[in-house]
């Protein structure tokens, strides 16, 4: 297991359990978020879609103090054409985080969706070479990433990478390829918080999620935290959510990030109620 150390500026993040990385509509009340956005010990983050920040009367940095590109840091967005690198969208969010001195999360290195289509045409050996090249390119571009979603949505029935054989396939643990991905990420970013991220974790596939993350942890994978996507919270009671979160945390005993929280309404009053 990797040593739990990160760059000094973000060292406190590993103790922020649960910290929040929300994909949600912004509330109209900036005052409610201003206290969190200026708190150095915790953060409430959001996504940026096509770098849609600081438009209108409310500035992103007054509402949130963490940023994640929704699509711009995915492999297909950056290398849709083989060796045709497009870093512009990711650069915008990365530089914005630097400017305002809050964490940037890279989402994501390995996923069974939004990866380059040309990868499917390659042999397993060539796929591995391309994965190495991809991670090396990200490392060269962003050597100081504080947080990384290393693998996304690999619970059975979700979207495990079709190219997983290039990383060793299921192997003895059933998730050898995920372990390999974390090892490769740790080699390049030994001080980053390395995260496994998935959905349906609070309700429908909680046990499968726990099994996957626990398998990684017990196998010695350099995983620092897990992200529980929160798309399914809108119709979940507070007591049920608390019970599910306690069950997950007791089983895994690792830092948790509540990620990708959606509030499917444009009604500000209802959004405020949901946040509370």
Kindly give the residue locations of the regions a language model identified:
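Aromatic- and acid-rich polysaccharide-binding/catalytic face
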Residues: 64-71, 146, 152, 196-198, ...
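Boundary/entry segment of secreted carbohydrate-active catalytic domains
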Residues: 35-70
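Substrate-binding cleft and catalytic face of glycoside hydrolase catalytic domains
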Residues: 62-80, 88-202
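Alpha-helical scaffolding within the catalytic cores
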Residues: 50-62, 86-93, 133-134, 138, ...
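Active-site clefts of carbohydrate-active enzymes
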Residues: 108-109, 114, 193-201, 230-232, ...
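Acidic-and-aromatic substrate-binding clefts and catalytic sites of carbohydrate-active enzymes
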Residues: 45-58, 75-88, 115, 155-158, ...
